[in-house]
């Protein structure tokens, strides 16, 4: 017998998260690790929980996540995006409040590439008039 589950892929910066929602008690597992031990920063944990808190369904689902690439901030954003998509798959009526909160839109900002002749993407070497 197969358990009902909802899937969502989330991306942010260079991170990609595969999120599975199953009806449960509210346990969030990231890469076979508890959420609180995976993310050191409280802000990253808050970001992950945002869509569930918005809909008041924090205790209704168990969340299983595999996330690759990027750093803690990008991974947290990718997980949030994946949870949002899975919640929309669960119930299309969730789309409107999640859209209003800005969780449905993929944050398209990426790191700007370093240019030749510059120190970083935009930082120029010191200019000397004489």
Swiss-Prot record:
GO cellular component terms, A-Z: cytosolic small ribosomal subunit
Keywords from the UniProt entry: Ribonucleoprotein, Ribosomal protein
Keyword Kinase on entry: no
Record-given protein name: Small ribosomal subunit protein uS9
Gene Ontology terms: biological process: translation
Annotated source species: Hahella chejuensis (strain KCTC 2396)
Lineage, highest ranks first: Bacteria, Pseudomonadati, Pseudomonadota, Gammaproteobacteria, Oceanospirillales
HAMAP family registered for this protein in UniProt: Ribosomal_uS9_B (MF_00532_B)
Similarity comment text for this entry: Belongs to the universal ribosomal protein uS9 family.
GO MF terms, alphabetically ordered: RNA binding; structural constituent of ribosome
């Amino acid at each position: 017998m197969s358990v009902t589950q909802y899937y969502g892929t989330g991306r942010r910066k260079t991170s990609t998260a595969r999120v599975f929602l199953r009806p449960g008690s509210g346990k969030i597992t990231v890469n076979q690790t508890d959420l609180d031990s995976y993310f050191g920063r409280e802000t990253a944990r808050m970001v992950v929980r945002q869509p569930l808190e918005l809909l008041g369904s924090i205790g209704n689902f168990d969340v299983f996540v595999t996330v690759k690439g990027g750093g803690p901030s990008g991974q947290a954003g990718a997980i949030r995006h994946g949870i949002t998509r899975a919640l929309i798959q669960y119930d299309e009526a969730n789309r409107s409040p999640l859209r209003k909160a800005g969780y449905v839109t993929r944050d398209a900002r990426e790191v700007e590439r370093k240019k030749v002749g510059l120190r970083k993407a935009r930082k120029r070497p010191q200019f000397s008039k004489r």
